[in-house]
From Swiss-Prot:
Superkingdom field: Bacteria
Record GO cellular component, one term: cytosol
Cofactor: binding comment: Binds 1 FAD per subunit.
Protein name: N-methyl-L-tryptophan oxidase
HAMAP family for this protein: MTOX (MF_00515)
Cofactor(s) named in the record: FAD
Residue numbers binding FAD: 4-34
Similarity-based family: Belongs to the MSOX/MTOX family. MTOX subfamily.
UniProt KW Oxidoreductase keyword: yes
Enzyme Commission (EC) number: 1.5.3.-
Length: 372
């Protein structure tokens, strides 16, 4: 059988692509080296932020707004356990923060619902938070967080119900291109398609070693908290920048545990076995202490944590482009630790590519040619 589309990597973007392409009537094969959702990539740990006034650059705002529409649609499949939780997101940092300046600019350009608070206003609204006098907060009322593993599980189930073929626990070992399309090699045999999407995450270079993607080991952890830090008490998800530039992110507490991670830093790795479990690097359990001591002093000890990986591009912007020399193969990689919120729209973009539809978005900033 020759498929219309083969998806290599069915984590966040791949799961979405499988669903949207199958829903569009294509004959699709989803593949993954493991059984998604799983613990081997970048999507585990239950939750991911979604921010609209994007501090990483205005070019992302049209994408994230479409992503939000698609997340809302997906959430309707799980109304008893919603995939998107509109908790709000408070972005904290020094008044001269470049990141917060980008957030404010994005909000102004796209007329987003963002409220600016000074230090006293932040602490009055959320007494659990402590910030210096020179800090500001930009509160995104309509943002929140996503249930990452639930989202992937839902997409995969919906795709399967729509007739999508799924080949999991089966690594793709090679990709070949010829006049007839794309062939993938797996331990289970060879499969052909007219087009392919490569969204293999951290280890995409195992298949395409020429790509400028660097795996980085990262950790996040859950710390002892109480009901003051919960959604029920209107405690928001958050990003926070320390005076030294370190960037943190976190979520409202659930079951008396608050999840937090550090966005920058981490350990450069070159193989999967170098991504050692949480606590095998001495700094893992204490990485968030500088932020917690200064900004959330009421949070208690580290309860447990997990390791994941970022697939970093050189400039930490996404790579969305066809494979050089092969216009029938789309790459979506280099998501650099801020990609999950876009998984829905990136999956839709992949499905459009498979249907020979022109994208509704300007993807020029994400081309590989910027690294030449």
């Amino acid at each position: 059988m020759k498929y219309d589309l083969i998806i290599i990597g069915s984590g966040s973007v791949g799961a979405a692509a499988g669903y949207y392409a199958t829903r569009a009537g294509l004959n699709v094969l989803m593949t993954d080296a493991h059984m998604p959702p799983h613990q081997h990539g970048s999507h585990h740990g239950d939750t991911r932020l979604i921010r609209h006034a994007y501090g990483e650059g205005e070019k992302y705002v049209p994408l994230v707004l479409r992503a939000q529409t698609l997340w809302d649609e997906l959430s309707r499949h799980n109304e008893d356990d919603p995939i998107f939780v509109r908790s709000g997101v408070i972005n904290l940092g020094p008044a001269d923060s470049a990141f917060l300046a980008n957030v404010a600019h994005s909000a102004e350009q796209w007329q987003l619902n963002v409220e600016k608070l000074d230090a006293q206003g932040i602490m009055a609204r959320w007494p659990e938070i402590r910030v210096p006098d020179n800090y500001i907060g930009l509160f995104e009322t309509d943002s929140g967080f996503l249930r990452s593993e639930l989202a992937i599980k839902t997409w995969i189930q919906l795709a399967k119900e729509a007739g999508c073929a799924q080949l999991f626990n089966c690594p793709v070992t090679a990709i070949r291109h010829d006049d007839d399309g794309v062939t993938i090699e797996t331990v289970d045999g060879e499969y052909q398609a007219k087009k392919a999407i490569v969204c293999a995450g951290t280890w995409v270079k195992d298949l395409l070693p020429e790509l400028p993607v660097q795996p980085v080991r990262k950790v996040f952890a859950w710390y002892q908290a109480d009901g003051r830090y919960s959604v029920k008490n209107k405690f928001p998800a958050f990003t926070g920048e320390l005076p030294n530039g370190d960037q943190y992110y976190g979520f409202p507490a659930e079951n008396d545990a608050l999840k937090i991670g550090k966005h920058n830093g981490g350990q450069v790795i070159h193989s999967a076995d170098e991504r050692v479990p949480f606590a095998e690097v001495v700094s893992d359990g204490s990485e968030a202490f500088p932020f917690l001591r200064n900004v959330l002093p009421g949070i208690g000890c580290c309860l447990y944590g997990a390791a994941c990986t970022y697939d970093n591009s050189p400039d930490e912007d996404f790579i969305i482009d066809t494979l050089p020399g092969h216009d029938n193969t789309l790459l979506i990689t280099g998501l650099s630790g801020h990609g999950f919120k876009f998984a829905s729209v990136l999956g839709e973009i992949a499905a459009d590519f498979a249907q020979d539809k022109k994208s509704d978005f300007d993807l020029t900033p994400f081309r590989l040619s910027r690294f030449q």
